[in-house]
Design a protein with these regions (language model features):
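Bacterial N-terminal signal peptides that target proteins for export
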Residues: 1-8
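Bacterial N-terminal signal peptides
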Residues: 8-18
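Immediate post-signal-peptide N-terminus of mature secreted/exported proteins
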Residues: 27-29, 33
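Structural detector for internal amphipathic alpha-helices that build alpha-solenoid repeat scaffolds
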Residues: 33-37, 41-54, 64-65, 73-88, ...
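Terminal, low-structured helical/coil segments at or just beyond the last alpha-helical repeat
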Residues: 214-258
Length: 258
């Protein structure tokens, strides 16, 4: 059985879609009260969808609830609701929430700032990203940094790459591929042999160096085409024959510790 926090992370990654019929007879205030008091995350998500589908003007009451609730799940889910409703007046609250003690609150605050394209949040996002140690929060912050095109994050991304593994490293490589420059190719190429991050490294190099490694495979490990996919093999061969063209860099050798 999935833990409540695992379900929470899944919900974090699931966009709000108009798939729940609005309960027209119930007021937004009543729905939000039930939403705050609900502890089952799936039911809580259902109530949030009902609110956002029913009331396009629910941004202000969602913000008031997020500011006043003692339930951290209510707080981070309300942030998602405000982002869905494009309620940009919540930006100061989101920025303050980047320092929250709950990782899911920080994650969603960062992601909502990106989704809402709050460009003047770059300083706060950079500070949060620099200090962040939670993998899921790192992932969502890296997505927000990409959405806001915060290129000043590149040195921080380079620092975090060898520290985190798995999916978090994939997100970081993807962010570096979008925010970095051709000077970042050697660092990224060091992950081409990684079973988890190899495909992300391939795509990042394709983006930064403008090199085509062939069509994207639709499968990964265990798929029809097997692993590594042809484009990653092509990227490895390309790097082997071209790496002498790049200067040596001290942080180009991955040292995994997380």
């Amino acid at each position: 059985m999935l833990s409540s926090r695992t379900v929470a992370v899944f919900l974090l990654m699931t966009p709000l879609v108009p798939s729940v019929l609005a309960q027209r007879s119930e007021s937004t205030a009543s729905l939000l009260l039930r939403f705050d008091n609900e502890h089952d995350l799936a039911a809580k998500e259902h109530l949030l969808l009902t609110v956002t589908n029913k009331d396009a003007g629910a941004g202000p009451p969602l913000l008031r609830l997020a500011e006043s609730t003692t339930n951290s799940d209510t707080r981070w889910m309300a942030m998602r609701g405000m982002a869905t409703l494009r309620y940009t007046d919540c930006a100061p609250f989101l920025e303050a929430s980047l320092k929250d003690s709950d990782a899911l609150v920080r994650s969603n605050a960062a992601r909502a700032l990106g989704d809402l394209r709050i460009g003047n949040a770059s300083t706060a996002l950079l500070a949060m990203f620099a200090a962040e140690q939670d993998p899921e929060a790192i992932q969502q912050a890296s997505a927000a940094l990409q959405m806001l095109d915060i290129k000043a994050a590149v040195p921080l991304i380079r620092e975090k790459l060898p520290v985190f593994t798995g999916q978090t490293r994939e997100w970081l490589i993807g962010a570096l591929g979008m925010l970095g420059s051709i000077r970042d190719v050697p660092l990224i190429a060091g992950y081409l042999d990684d079973d988890v991050s190899g495909m992300a490294a391939t795509e990042a190099i394709r983006e930064l160096a403008g090199v085509s490694f062939g069509p994207l495979s639709l499968s990964t490990n265990g798929g029809v085409n097997g692993y590594p996919p042809p484009e990653t093999l092509a990227a490895r061969a390309w790097w082997k024959s071209h790496k002498v063209e790049w200067p040596h860099c001290d942080d180009c050798h991955p040292k995994s510790s997380r």
